[in-house]
Amino acid sequence: MFSYSQAIRFIIFLLPICLTFKITENRIDRGKLNFEIQDITIKSGAFWSIVDNSICTFFGSLMVEPQASLYVSSTSPILALQVAFVSILGVFHNQGNITFDSSASLTSATYRIITSTFRNTGRMFFSASGKFPNTMDIVASDWTNNGLLSFHQDQRTSGVVSLGSALGTITNNGQIKLSNQVYQQRTQISGSGCFVAINNSTIYISNSLLPVQITQSFYLADSTSSIIVDSFSATQTFNVYGFGNGNMIGLTLPLVGNYWYSSYTYDATTGILIMRNVFLEQKFNIGLGYNPSLFKIVTDWGAGIPSTILGSLSYSGCVPSRRLPSICQIDPISSLEIPGTKPTQFTSVFVSTDDSGRNGQYVGLFEVATNKNYEWVSAVIIITSIPTVTIELPPTLTLEAQWLPTVSGVLHTSSTITQSTKIGLLTTVSLVPVAETQLASRTFSIVGPPIPDTTSLELVVPTKSETRVVTESTVVPVLPPKVTHFTNSSTSNRRYSSESMVDEEFPSEPFMSDEVSIEVYESYTDESCVISTDFSVDVDYSSDLSMNFQTYDTLDTTEMFNTVENFETYDTFGTIESFDIFETSQTFESYETFNETSDLSMFSLTSESFSDLPPPLVQTDTPVSFNPVPSRTNMSEKTIMWEVTNSQGSIITESGIILISGEYQTTVTTFLRDLDQMEGYTKYTKTWEVTNSNGSVVTESGIIDESGSYHTTVTTFPQKDQNWEWAANTVEYTKTWIVTNEDGSIITESGIVGESGLYQTTVTTFPHELSSFTIYQSEEAHSPGVINAGDIESTPLATSSSIYQSVIIEDEFPSSPGNTYTDVFSPTTGHDLDLPDDTTFTPSQSSSTTVPIESEYISESIILDAGSSVSTMISPTTLTTNFPIFDSSDNQFKHVSLWDSRVSSRSIVIVSSEFPESDAPLILASPNDGSSNQTSTTASITVNDNQNINNPEFQQGEAVISSSIDSSVSHLYYISEETSIASNNGDLSDDLEVDFILLTSLHDTISAKATSAGYSWKFYPESDEIQIDQTGDYNYSLAGAKTHIHESAYTQQDASTQKGASVQQETSIQQRVSTKQETYTQEGTQQVTRTQEKVQQGASHSTTNSHFEGTFISKTASPTNNDFTLSFEPKDNATDISNSFFAHLSIVGNSTVFETDYTDFSFIANSNTFKSDANGVDSTSNQTYSAGVGGSNVSGLISKSESVVLLIRPVMIFVFLAICVVIML
């Protein structure tokens, strides 16, 4: 029979049999928290903050992954932390950050880690107030530190830090930092790490019989630190850095010499300091450069160590120069900011019922803070009701355009450029009536926000002791939009005139990003105990200016015709130039010295020169202006002129801006001199001969700049080709001709043609105009060959999204009905896709053909300010060409094209969430009201946490409403997942509740109404690790209700189960809701559950935890891998239920079955016959999924709940252990 101690050991051996508690997202627990026997893992990217839980005892292993954090803190001044990690056979492994902080408490804190293996490769911070002695121990048989261990107290007391198991070994390859602390050594120390003592800290080597590896370093970081070594041990050598300025090295016995040696000796050649008590001695490698006359025997009176009278040695001089190991460099971060320790406020949206029984949505401002008893409480500060926000999208447009032929066969249409942004960029379109003999005239006017003339940036670089160097070095001129006017006119028997005005398009304001990074380096130099500190400031200044602008050329052409066909052409080409930018050097220096003397030290601070800053950008005709450098003295600046003698001895005059401060003056900027003001400078026109590569000699001319013996060609005039034999008889004129493309389409081109005798040469071909067509609707048809612009309405129906180069229509239509017509036209798209070149048709009212044109995606972007932009995406456009309608009565016809611009007609309602902690998107959409064979797209609205609900963000193409001709039912739905896992003192619920929204777009072919909506949903495990007890029960609650319409509904639920029992129940639900459910079950057969659910007119919200209207039904079964179908049908089969359904799914697992980390649900419309596997996504990402066309994709919803140790499992374990103990006894 086992003894009692053996039984205890056996129980301890079985204790690690527990689940692993995983932290996968940020979590804050305040107040009392119960801990189970379980291993804890904090995943990368997450933290767990435990606030004001005074006693934290963890049983099990701990793993903190990289980029993860664990915080245990106390904000109460009364109760300090008592933290213990106990796992005899467990592992404590930190790769991230761990903080234990009880600095706010006035009582003693205890931090104790007792485990089999301790590994630290991250950072660990232990902090306490130090009002009373604190305990900080890390005990492990396998102890390794490769990171940072920081032990801090606000003041030093007798408490000590203990590392490792007694008489064991610790391996330190990292840094162990002590601040107002005492480390007492009780183990061997191996490794190549470093112990750092700072702020009145002491390193106490209390048992030198346990060796310290020679590669270990000890750094005394300031004048108040010390190290003490036990005298009763074998002689060792300790590497000590930073000895000097009054800090101490001592023994546990007084320093007393013997007959042969004194109490201490220093070897100036090896840097070894030997300290003795008669025949006991210890060696310290302090380095070279010490003056033996500055050593002094003193007493270390520090708390927590044996104070030996005259047992220590100090050095009153400065620390000689010596290279400090990199592992001893002090980490500037002494602690980490702990989340959850400060009062916070958050906004929550909730539903409340008023006295009249109506439900309303409210937004409340909550504050979480501590009361007078230092307990965390939550209180409501402000409550405001919020309305439901409805956003109306523009309706689907059916566009009819008239393609009207002209006498010459060239179609001239009005075009416009349209931009729409959030800042209200205004577009105006004017349609000018055109007479029969005139070409179409168009006017574009794009007006944007006012643009400032100049934009200046100011860089302020603060330095030590109130010294500031201020730079205003960048002036960016922005010209207002320039306008180009051009008029083309020709005089002959007929006169054509058109005038256009085009405003240059500038962005609303220039986008400018400036990044300034400043690094301050400090270097200390100790000479004769006078510490001189130099500060050097490195400034990295970068500026990025992004501007989009266009420049238009001005073309003025006048053509004169007379009776003898002689004419002259005057070509005037004017170009509107964009503003020129040149760089001017800018150098200024500001020196300021501030001396401060004291008894101990002197500091000299000098600000650095900023001559390497980038030069400013200035306009040629804009004077340079700078702000003066601020200083404590009075400064002024003025523009003066002075004489300078150049290298050739000549005297020239320069001017610039001078900064005057007292009797000093500094040149800030020197103005560039004009070339024509330079001495000896001339400019003239000259002609010279040039020999070409073929040996011919040609004459060139140009403008020459000459100054002294130097001359430079500024401009060379273009020469005429002298090799034309008929050059003298050549005339140039504008001509239009027809060109047949490779695909057979016919287009018209025009250009300037040079003609001499029988020769014609095209000099210039005018490019085709690129524009976006605006289609206008006209109710009155026109006769062939006539353009009557007066009948065209000036309001455009829509603007197409394609870029068309040219549209040519040749009129070959006879004027009698019943004949065959040929319509030749070629609208060219960006993808070189053309409509059919020849379309032969007979006039008919019903015949039509559809030709899709896939145009380019046009992304129009306007820059608002740094870091934000507004983009407009235009979808592909489909062009439907109908046969022309011919009316024989007045010989009029219409050629109609149908454009589907893919804009859906729908209302989108944003419903606020009642779960403020959830990041789930809030999405609700209405169906497509068009016919079943209409193709369109809709935009989803996603409201982020940091986004105002009144300004939703539109994203194109995330959801698709589509129906094909083969199917009379189309379907769209979202699943907006909101999970709420309640936490009560650390206990997590394994139940699952999912709120989702079923969106329907159901239309029958006759009445265009939705009379039924069916959904299938499936529950199945995601991985093999999930254990589901077939004998257990799940309670399912699924509710659905018509959105915003209170009418009767009938619900039918079919379910197939593997095993069940006969159940018949009747349930009555309050608030005017009744439910009757009958269940028939047979062993091994299908189970059919029929539920009749009646929602009375005007029924209010259910009392269940949901804001959805309707009746909740429940069913008890064990539905592993079962499919369920829920159908909504109006009782009278006449009510249109095309809108959305609210639904709430609740799954409650009994304690023996719901032991899973992941749960996957799939909601599939009945019309989707093909079911794809759902892809599992963590619910923390709060993704929104949509069904694809024809069931190609299936929405997946995964809800992840933390695994918790259920009550029954530890009970069973302890019952099993008790039985084992009884057997052993």
Curated annotation (Swiss-Prot):
Lipidation (GPI-anchor amidated serine): S1195
Signal peptide bounds: 1-20
Main location (coarse class): secreted
Its membrane topology: Lipid-anchor; GPI-anchor
Keywords on record: Cell wall, Glycoprotein, GPI-anchor, Lipoprotein, Membrane, Secreted, Signal, Virulence
Protein task: GPI-anchored cell wall protein involved in cell wall organization, hyphal growth, as well as in host-fungal interaction and virulence.
Protein name per its UniProtKB record: Hyphally regulated cell wall protein 4
Organism: Candida albicans (strain SC5314 / ATCC MYA-2876) (Yeast)
